[in-house]
């Protein structure tokens, strides 16, 4: 019997969230028999990268979710006290809290090279279905779907630092939020 709800988790820094995240979530929702996709911004980056504050990244993810009909949601689970920022710990907590949900994890093929550094990846595979999406420039066997758009949060931050508008890479509501709050060096809007 199919579980009541099937949820795919798309974790990341979302610093900022962009159309690549939206396209990946939309692809999984449309083709992989999941009811919801949850964006899961990291509280702190497990490898120490600097990010905008969590609340701002959550708000920009919420703006991205507003582009959908309710199947895309933002999870604040990573702000839970005691979580390490490691996927296996977050997933273990989610499984304990929601045993009726069938969990999936979405990763891009660009992440495959980092898996040896992930804590207990074998446990992640036991707790969830791991979906590896085909990211352009990172060919790998057994990936799902066509290559994803070549867009990254790093590229967007670089464009913003040069004073260029990434309007075709970041949904309007998310970039408006960033501008309103002066994130990424953007001048605040009144």
From Swiss-Prot:
One of its GO terms (molecular function) is ATP binding. Keywords: ATP-binding, NAD, Nucleotide-binding, Nucleotidyltransferase, Pyridine nucleotide biosynthesis, Transferase. GO terms for biological process: NAD biosynthetic process. It comes from the Bacteria. The keyword Calcium does not apply. InterPro entries: Cyt_trans-like, NadD/NMNAT, Rossmann-like_a/b/a_fold. It holds the Pfam family CTP_transf_like. It catalyses: nicotinate beta-D-ribonucleotide + ATP + H(+) = deamido-NAD(+) + diphosphate. Its EC number is 2.7.7.18. Gene3D superfamilies: HUPs (3.40.50.620). The keyword NAD applies. SUPFAM superfamilies: Nucleotidylyl transferase. Signal peptide: none annotated. Pathway: Cofactor biosynthesis; NAD(+) biosynthesis; deamido-NAD(+) from nicotinate D-ribonucleotide: step 1/1. Catalyzes the reversible adenylation of nicotinate mononucleotide (NaMN) to nicotinic acid adenine dinucleotide (NaAD). Belongs to the NadD family. This is Probable nicotinate-nucleotide adenylyltransferase. The gene is nadD.
């Amino acid at each position: 019997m199919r579980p009541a709800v099937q949820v795919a988790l798309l974790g990341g820094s979302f610093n900022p969230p962009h159309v690549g995240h939206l396209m990946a979530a939309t692809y999984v929702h449309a083709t992989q028999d999941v009811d919801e996709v949850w964006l899961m911004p990291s509280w702190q980056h497990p490898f120490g990268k600097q990010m905008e504050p969590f609340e701002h990244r959550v708000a920009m993810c919420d703006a991205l979710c507003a582009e959908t009909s309710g199947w895309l949601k933002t999870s604040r689970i990573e702000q839970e006290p005691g979580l390490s920022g490691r996927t296996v710990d977050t997933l273990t907590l989610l499984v304990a809290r929601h045993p009726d949900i069938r969990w999936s994890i979405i990763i891009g093929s660009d992440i495959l090279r980092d898996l040896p550094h992930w804590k207990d990846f074998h446990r992640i595979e036991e707790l969830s279905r791991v979906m590896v999406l085909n990211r352009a420039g990172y060919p790998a066997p057994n990936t799902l779907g066509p290559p994803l758009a070549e867009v990254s949060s790093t590229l967007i931050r670089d464009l913003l630092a040069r004073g260029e508008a990434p309007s075709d890479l970041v949904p309007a509501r998310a970039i408006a939020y960033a501008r309103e709050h002066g994130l990424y060096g953007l001048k605040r809007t009144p």
